[in-house]
Design a protein with these regions (language model features):
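Active-site-proximal loop/turn and secondary-structure-junction residues that shape catalytic pockets
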Residues: 9, 34-36, 61-64, 105-109, ...
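Active-site acidic/histidine proton-transfer and metal-coordination neighborhood
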Residues: 74-173, 183
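Histidine-acidic metal/acid-base catalytic patches
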Residues: 1-26, 88-91, 97-99, 159-172, ...
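N-terminal substrate-binding region of glycoside hydrolase catalytic domains
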Residues: 21, 25-39, 59, 64
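Glycine-rich, proline-tolerant flexible connector loops at the mouths of alpha/beta enzymes
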Residues: 31-51, 105, 111-112, 148
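Short catalytic-loop micro-motif centered on adjacent basic/acidic residues
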Residues: 5, 29-34, 175-177
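A short acidic, helix-capping loop that chelates divalent metal ions and anchors anionic groups
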Residues: 64-74, 109-113, 145-150, 209-215, ...
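Conserved beta-strand positions in the central sheet of alpha/beta enzyme cores
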Residues: 31, 57-59, 102, 139, ...
Length: 273
């Protein structure tokens, strides 16, 4: 497995600063957030080559089909605009040769489950077609059940696989976010029996302190992260472990990019033995 760091973990730095710091820390790959990319893709690719980084997975500028309920990340309200943006991101991000490009459903936000599901299935089919045209793997990310009203109405591995089955999209993978799925009973069976469906891994831990909504480095919480790494290794899965830390301003996000990258590498390296 390769080791990667997702750019949201160093939200206050630029793409160029991320690339330099992640490479200097010893990461193999970067998890790109499209909103951080400068417009010149050729220059961006040259910078990645210069520093020897590959791309783990990409998060599109508009990552959900239905509008997010996270303050500051809502984006357009119209699902049609969101789907068109998601398809455009597939075409742009293909140049970076990522392991996958992810999407989430978004929350229902007052829609009936049937109405929301119909919109999402249409969006997934169109995004998958756009991904197929440029040889990109689309990955659907479930979110933890506590984020049903803000992030996604797909809150388990079973939900995600059922949605993809209903959409007729068996080629679409799953983005396994350990923070979201560490307590899903189906996690271990997915890794052991169907690791080929895992198109990417986001890696963070669930804090030990009750009431916290941020994430901590792998190995610092209660999320059985070492067991996940061992299970992935046993299954033969060989993608990137992409450390992804959503933080509070005075916690992990307060670190300078170089220090954040070093801390993240030390944490994930300790689990990959």
């Amino acid at each position: 497995m390769k080791l990667a760091l997702s750019e949201i973990s160093t939200v206050n730095s630029t793409f160029a600063e991320d690339v330099a710091a992640y490479a200097a820390a010893g990461f193999d790959a970067i998890g790109i957030w499209e909103f951080k990319l400068p417009d010149d893709d050729e220059a961006n690719l040259a910078l990645l080559r210069q520093h020897g980084l590959t791309v783990a997975n990409c998060v599109p500028t508009v990552p959900t089909i239905l509008q997010l309920g996270i303050p500051g990340m809502e984006g357009p309200a119209d699902p049609e605009i969101r789907i068109e943006g998601l398809c455009a991101s597939m075409r742009r991000l293909a140049a970076y040769d990522p392991e996958s490009v992810l999407c989430l459903t978004g929350p229902l936000a007052g829609r009936t489950p049937d109405d929301g599901r119909a919109i999402v299935i249409d969006g997934l089919r169109r995004a998958a077609a756009a991904a197929r045209e440029v040889d990109v793997t689309l990955a659907l990310e479930p979110a933890h059940r506590t984020q049903r009203e803000t992030t996604s109405f797909v809150n388990s591995i079973e939900d995600a696989l059922a949605l993809l089955h209903d959409a007729g999209l068996d080629e679409v993978g799953l983005l396994l976010d350990v923070y979201h799925l560490w307590d899903d009973p189906a996690l271990w069976d997915l890794i052991a029996r169907a690791s080929y469906r895992i198109a990417g891994v986001h890696f963070a831990d669930w804090p030990t302190e009750a009431g916290r909504t941020d994430r901590v480095l792998p190995g610092e919480g209660v999320g059985r992260t070492k067991e996940v790494v061992d299970a992935l290794a046993l299954s033969g899965w060989d993608g990137s472990l992409d450390v992804e830390i959503f933080s509070e301003p005075d916690r992990f996000w307060a670190h300078p990019v170089d220090e954040a990258a070093r801390r993240a590498l030390a944490a994930v390296s300790a689990l990959v033995v």
